[in-house]
A protein has these predicted regions:
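Residue-level "edge-of-site" marker
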Residues: 95, 185, 209
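Short hydrophobic alpha-helical runs that function as membrane-insertion/retention elements
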Residues: 91, 183, 204-207
Length: 374
């Protein structure tokens, strides 16, 4: 949750930033989330962002690459993103390189001579098994090995990736190229990657494009920006938006948000309280479930961590920005140590609980009841 405070005399300034703030937060949160799902499906294999040409525009490509790196991608093929954010840049040859030459072997040979330390050959321009792999092997043996170099990898961008990767792995291993990596691309996402690996695909890394950079399966991240309180005579009076849809009813007033952890350090819920309200976890802490208010529940043997941190004061940044590497490491730590595996399922994930302190819940219910008389 992000809180933006603007006093009545400058309220319009808070309103002016709404679109820009939501555009940045929604887009990059969406791409980082999608990337994390893809990275999880890859089960430790490298995932790279190959999506620039299918992004909605260049800003989406560049900032999408940044978000993908935060989400766990090891690099991007978008060179500008690499320059702007110091993200590792990776990529392979294009089909146009192969097609420019009359002979596939000549195309591979010239590429290897130009990039001997990182030769990854695209083998599906004509016939993966019939010509692509044989020519790649020939380049490895006749061009690279005499230079003291090894063929770094091959890439396939079409066909049955599970079947082809198994055939290719055997062909490479049979000629002593066990260290040659197999890179695959072609409309990949977490579901296709899971399926390929379940079928025994022999793949070392994935280049993921359109379905990552557009989050094709679920292309909207629905964060909203709503007024929750208005300054009146030096204090903030809560405001609530009522809706025909219960999920669109806003949470009123100034508030604090705490993350609640069990003894093992797992996050069990987030807790909304009134701003400044004391949260004492030394004794069982009763809370209100806004979805199932009839349930009488409490947190026991838990700890609470306040999530909000003031970043801007009187228009000035008061906290140094975190590096991209620090942000990426924070995401990795959160997902590996604090978030339950059940909450990270691709299908029907367990929902992370969002609860309320009794005082906050009572305030919200009072405002809902009062709204009936208006």
């Amino acid at each position: 949750m992000c809180r933006v405070t603007g006093f009545r005399r400058v309220l319009f300034r808070s309103q002016l930033i709404e679109t820009a703030l939501l555009a940045q937060v929604n887009h990059q949160s969406l791409i980082a989330t999608k990337t994390r799902r893809i990275v999880s499906a890859a089960e430790g294999r490298a995932v790279s962002d190959f999506g620039a040409r299918r992004a909605h525009n260049m800003d989406a490509a560049v900032y999408g690459a940044r978000a993908a790196y935060i989400g766990g991608a090891v690099g991007t093929a978008t060179v500008l993103a690499g320059q702007m954010f110091d993200i590792p840049v990776s990529g392979t040859m294009a089909h146009s390189w192969v097609m420019y030459y009359k002979d596939e072997f000549e195309a591979f040979k010239h590429y290897a001579e130009n990039y001997p330390d990182g030769t990854v050959l695209l083998v599906d321009t004509y016939d993966v098994i019939g010509s692509g792999i044989p020519n790649a092997i020939r380049v490895a043996k006749e061009v690279l090995e005499p230079m003291g170099k090894r063929l770094k990898g091959i890439r396939i961008d079409s066909g049955d990736l599970a079947y082809l990767s198994k055939k290719i792995r055997k062909m490479l291993d049979d000629v002593g190229l066990e260290d040659c990596k197999i890179v695959v691309s072609n409309s990949l996402d977490e579901y296709t990657i899971t399926s390929i690996l379940q079928q025994g695909g022999k793949i070392d890394s994935f280049g993921v494009g359109e379905r990552l950079i557009t989050a094709k399966s679920d292309p909207v991240f629905g964060a909203v920006y709503k007024i929750s309180a208005v300054e009146e005579n030096g204090t903030f009076a809560p405001r609530i938006k009522i809706s025909e849809n219960v999920e669109k009813i806003t949470n009123p007033g100034l508030k604090d948000v705490y993350r609640i952890y069990d003894e093992a350090g797992h996050s069990v819920a987030d807790l909304i309280t009134k701003a400044g309200e004391k949260v004492d976890m030394s004794v069982p802490y009763r809370y209100a479930d806004p979805v199932k208010p009839w349930k009488n529940r409490s947190f026991e043997n838990c700890t609470a961590k306040k999530l909000q941190q003031q970043v801007v004061k009187e228009g000035k940044r008061i906290v140094e920005p975190e590096s991209l590497e620090d942000i990426r490491a924070y995401v990795e730590k959160q997902l590996n140590t604090e978030v339950w595996e059940e909450e990270q399922r691709f299908e029907n994930p367990h929902e992370h609980y969002l609860d309320m302190s009794p005082a906050y819940y009572e305030m919200k219910m009072d405002m809902l009841h009062e709204s009936r008389t208006r």
